[in-house]
Amino acid sequence: MSRQDKKLTGVFGHPVSDRENSMTAGPRGPLLMQDIYFLEQMSQFDREVIPERRMHAKGSGAFGTFTVTKDITKYTNAKIFSEIGKQTEMFARFSTVAGERGAADAERDIRGFALKFYTEEGNWDLVGNNTPVFFFRDPKLFVSLNRAVKRDPRTNMRDAQNNWDFWTGLPEALHQVTILMSDRGIPKDLRHMHGFGSHTYSMYNDSGERVWVKFHFRTQQGIENLTDEVAAEIIATDRDSSQRDLFEAIEKGDYPKWTMYIQVMTEEQAKNHKDNPFDLTKVWYHDEYPLIEVGEFELNRNPDNYFMDVEQAAFAPTNIIPGLDFSPDKMLQGRLFSYGDAQRYRLGVNHWQIPVNQPKGVGIENICPFSRDGQMRVVDNNQGGGTHYYPNNHGKFDSQPEYKKPPFPTDGYGYEYNQRQDDDNYFEQPGKLFRLQSEDAKERIFTNTANAMEGVTDDVKRRHIRHCYKADPEYGKGVAKALGIDINSIDLETENDETYENFEK
């Protein structure tokens, strides 16, 4: 019997005799508590919704295949990259960041770009965005970002004042804000945007030699974006425009592809790098650290059930494989805790047993975690009645020392170091990015900024103009004109008392 032909039962298999008429005392009487199907149906319904992600709540996803096209074994011994032509099953989830599950896809926002590779050495999660940088470089600010871009506690509305007050309080945010206000702030859809690992990671080879790397994913469909006006028209008729585009393209066999590249920096180069190479608000220039092709991935299968695969997909940067490692990037270090902890809250401690999260490349039957019990431990028989402690006489839970990573370079005493004393080069890179734009693209940055700052107080607008001017005088003048503010009325050389310097006092 096919699934389409199956007759209705309860969750424990009991046949349901009537799904349309409740059991009552007489034809018009009150309901009886012994109507077990009604009770079951409603109690299940009352619990259908799980907590949504605090960020990246609105998402779309698909399964696919990653294929190695170039040899990078001199940098890493990760088996996923071991030979040209090697293929690995994967899952990708794209998302907006600030909006809730019902948010419109065509909003001006960062896009999440999360990849899960089911390798033979375990799952590798690369949790990135469609931008190479972020708003700040210390994870202690992450909760504040969440609050600033989400709903105001009094009005329960998204508030541009909160948003821009926070962004302009952090001069290092200008790089990301410039990208967000540019044409790339609203991708046409998910297929026509690049992706970035954003953070600095590391690779090591069989000799234990470590290099620092950044991951890039360039769309093979080309870059296409939306103006504010076109995006507004799309949102008015289709709030799921990007999700619809991805799903329908895959359904008709028009499979999207991205090419994976890495940038490589040696440990010696990192020591001599002009800026902190682990600063998430900055990029590595391509002329100094060129893109090196690695492979490509193709998304070729839609999930059969959105909730099972997309909503329950759990990504965490702690899911990393031999041959790959972390870096001193403070934001990455913060996410090593936050992501897994959020998934355990949202999905439960055993969320790794959900099919989309299982280590398919290893096989669930071949893993041997030390964890036991917990809510919904169902897949691996809870390791049965065997030995559940270590050390023991059977060799169970023995370590695998052949997978030890090379020593991780660190230096200095533990202390709350002032990041602004270490690096205050906030404006060089956003200035270079601005100057790369065509004249028309610059004008759109000015207009988009003015649109986004509607309703924001003048003091915050002036703060943003000052930062833009420090990046490039033309940038500051253009934003000032779009906002209707006389740039000559602004002290362009100094910060006022409402800046980040005051926040730290």
Curated annotation (Swiss-Prot):
Residues reported to bind heme: Y339
Gene Ontology terms for molecular function: catalase activity; heme binding; metal ion binding
A Pfam family it matches: Catalase
Keyword Nucleotidyltransferase: no
SMART domains xref list: Catalase (SM01060)
Catalyses which reaction(s): 2 H2O2 = O2 + 2 H2O
Region (Disordered) residue spans: 1-25
Catalytic site positions: H56, N129
EC code(s) of this entry: 1.11.1.6
UniProt GO cellular component terms: cytoplasm
Cofactors, names only: heme
Keywords associated with the record: Heme, Hydrogen peroxide, Iron, Metal-binding, Oxidoreductase, Peroxidase
Gene Ontology BP terms: hydrogen peroxide catabolic process; response to hydrogen peroxide
Subunit structure, as described in the record: Homodimer.
PANTHER family in alphabetical order: CATALASE
Family of the protein in this entry: Belongs to the catalase family.
Role this protein plays: Decomposes hydrogen peroxide into water and oxygen; serves to protect cells from the toxic effects of hydrogen peroxide.
Listed name of the protein: Catalase
Native source species: Staphylococcus aureus (strain MRSA252)
Gene that specifies this protein: katA
